[in-house]
Amino acid sequence: MLMQEERELVVEYGKKMSAARLSTGTSGNISIYNAEKGLVALSPSGMDYFSTTPEDVVILDLDGKVVDGKRKPSSEWALHTTFYKHKPHARAVVHTHSVYCTTLAVLGEPIRAVHYVICLLYTSPS
């Protein structure tokens, strides 16, 4: 099976994400990018992480073409591949829907930086 290790990691961390209540049900998605192969292992669409197996994980190229897998890739595949195209050092994307983050988003209130390290991560949108 193509990208076996990456598939296993997507499943493992999907279960951890769900157990930590960072996402519920089938929400959220995880991908791992193998730059050497130019391929992405992406969680499948509409599956609970606790029932997902490595065989369910979809392998696609950076244009979204499914290379291996029988499942439909996450509907957020373009979000993941965009990160890998524009941030060459990125090797994984975790997109969650935690209750607290969703609540803050719905409130529409700004979230202030509370630690200097956040400034180190900022890059100008030039």
What is each model feature region?
Residues 4-94, 101, 112:
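An anion-binding catalytic pocket shared by soluble metabolic enzymes
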Residues 122-126:
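Conserved small/polar residues in nucleotide/adenosyl-binding loops
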Residues 99, 111-120:
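Ligand/cofactor pocket segment of small-molecule handling proteins
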Residues 100-108:
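Short active-site loop/helix that positions an aromatic residue
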